[in-house]
Amino acid sequence: DSHHPAAPGPEEVDWPAVHAVPMVLVTGSNGKTTTVRLLASVMKAWGRTPGLCSTDNIVIGDDIVDRGDWSGPMGARAVLRDPRVEVALLETARGGILRRGLSVERADAAIVTNVAADHFGEWGVFDLRGIAETKLVVGHVARRRVINAEDHVLGETLEAEQRRGRIRRTHHLVDHGQ
């Protein structure tokens, strides 16, 4: 595909130009695309060039690079390869996590919006707890996490993941219900 060429060989990489890009992973049953778009708007207002991949498209700055569902590893790869990107905002869908794992080994932040009763029976997930465990995988690689504490299943699953040591303790959960 001309939009997404094969990875270059080591001799073809401009190594002095390679640098870490701040990265945010966004997952959840609903609100992922809206969240990456909101973050992109904030980054642009701060004078940064965001790259985002979502279930709608890949966007670098104001340039729509491609349309379609790019919420998996191929979308993340396309964003991270673009030299214009100053911050990567990666919508991370459940299906991509279950089929291929996370597209990155580390992230600066992860956002989990919520969990809902959808896609049951696909890829070994049969209940809300399984969906929550899948979504919370993004927290395993993130330095900071924003978790919707008002989603009870997500909150309970987060506590269990923390007890198992899979996710570091989250000290500041925003819960408007208390």
Predicted regions and their residues:
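N-terminal leader/targeting and accessory segments in enzymes
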Residues: 1-13, 84
